[in-house]
């Protein structure tokens, strides 16, 4: 029996290795369109490969996976983050869980993952062919695949693990086979805020911020980094993921509301500010930073509120207090465009989960055609969750394929 795996990335290699272990007699070939395999793994986590997460801070799966949580809830019963941890350690890759719950190789080097995968593939007899771009696929009793427009091969089964496609046209061949395609759009990006003085605070971090998309219920909390182009950091990346499709529809022009202190209850903030006034009446406002925010950020807020920096707290007045409360909790910025995140490219969209059997990752319209990884309409916030989805869906597909062909 033969199977072609289209895409030499994380999901493709993980599927191939596990399939070959479960069904050694299956002939497995990985086809990669570029000259190098596992290129996205190489840059994951800034070159350190954030390969999973402890999930300790995830109360409900949809907070990590804005799209695909229902499929993964089922799939995690077979292979979850704990299984991932054990799998890699058993493969000779010691792991470490950071304070932020992100899981990395102890070596902090993504190349260790790449070397391990290539070594295992070689030992298991998996064939890897680079510079093979799939140009067509025809279904029948067997699948006929055409590469580079002139090389034809036939296989008993095919697994598509090509990752996220930036354009729907790249998925047209799957649509022709009867699959519903969700328009792919970026889902992890930073916010460009041109012509705003906030960019002068480049490098300033608000450790506990909350950012919401104005006019919606979408919001996220976490650390916010001010950059020379606008805003980045975990809270921005989360919000970009939660609102990926809506933000795309707005053509990346929208307003955000920032609570620099992760608090929007004006009464609570007023009580706190009034306590500062009582305790520091003769001190200059600029010298007492509320909520321990950065002094540079505090100066920015005072300038925006048009409050003189040499004014004393006792002279602030009710109007001044209200201005500060509003800017601490509800500071508005206009976003014009998006930026990339560490050269990583994650999309929402792809093959609709309506077209997939959750138990097996098999196509509902084509027997012996399987999917794994970001080609599916599954994506996550930053923190190792996207790679975990790749490992899980690849493992589920490997088990399903092995069970079918071992039974023949």
Per-range role (PLM):
Residues 1-11:
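Beta1/beta-strand and adjacent pyrophosphate-binding region of the FAD-binding site
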Residues 4, 20-46:
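Glycine-rich FAD pyrophosphate-binding loop
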Residues 4-6, 31, 134, 152-165, ...:
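Short hydrophobic core segments
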Residues 130, 299-379:
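A glycine-rich dinucleotide-binding beta-alpha-beta segment and adjacent secondary-structure elements
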Residues 130-143:
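A conserved short coil-to-beta-strand element within the FAD-binding core of flavoproteins
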Residues 161-177, 377-406:
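A conserved FAD-binding loop/helix module that cradles the flavin
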